[in-house]
């Protein structure tokens, strides 16, 4: 596309080693592939239907041996699909991160389903942006910044301000995967659909 990528991770993903409770469960839920990657004892869980948020989550799940059968770009869009598949009350195992939006579990519990949440990973915030990113930001050399989640956008904005780059933060083009991811930013363009393909389309069309 004619762009040079500059990486500055703002989150470090680490496993929690959480134990998986005994079922039975009707299906497994995942809003991030990390929930599956850090599942300490997947065992027979892979034989259960997997309901996932995001096409990428579903793709990685298949590569890991899971059986994704329902997926949507956002939790709110996944909820009606789950409601249409399962009679109440169904039992779900949600492999999740410690920092997450509660839309999925809240919506399922409100409908009378049982949701067991196992936090298999956590995302620790970085304490500073990468030196190369700070230098490029200060010099106005960043054409666009891509944001995949609300939390990572919040941390990026905070670290830029902490480095005295508030003005530069407001001048670059922010491209966000979703409206939620865009909310911490001074201004941002939002992908037509919440997936990487449409986010990169924003970059190509800017």
Show where each model-derived region lies.
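Signature of uroporphyrinogen-III synthase
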Residues: 1-206
């Amino acid at each position: 596309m004619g762009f040079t990528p500059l990486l500055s991770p703002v989150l470090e993903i680490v496993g929690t080693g959480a134990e998986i409770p005994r079922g039975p469960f009707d299906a497994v839920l995942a809003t991030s592939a990390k929930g599956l990657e850090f599942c300490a004892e997947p065992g027979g869980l892979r034989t259960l239907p997997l309901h996932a948020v995001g096409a990428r989550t579903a793709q990685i799940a298949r590569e890991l041996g899971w059986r994704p059968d329902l997926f949507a770009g956002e939790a709110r869009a996944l909820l009606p699909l789950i409601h249409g598949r399962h009679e109440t009350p169904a039992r779900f195992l949600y492999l999740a991160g410690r920092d997450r939006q509660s839309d999925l579990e809240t919506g399922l519990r409100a409908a009378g389903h049982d949701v067991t949440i196992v936090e298999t990973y956590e995302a620790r915030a970085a304490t500073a942006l990468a030196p190369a990113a700070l230098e490029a930001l200060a010099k106005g050399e960043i054409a666009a910044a891509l944001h995949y989640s609300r939390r990572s956008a919040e941390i990026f904005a905070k670290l830029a301000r902490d480095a005295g780059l508030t003005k530069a933060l407001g001048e670059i083009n922010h491209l966000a995967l979703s409206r939620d991811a865009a909310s911490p930013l001074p201004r941002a363009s939002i992908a037509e659909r919440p997936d990487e393909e449409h986010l990169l389309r924003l970059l190509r069309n800017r």
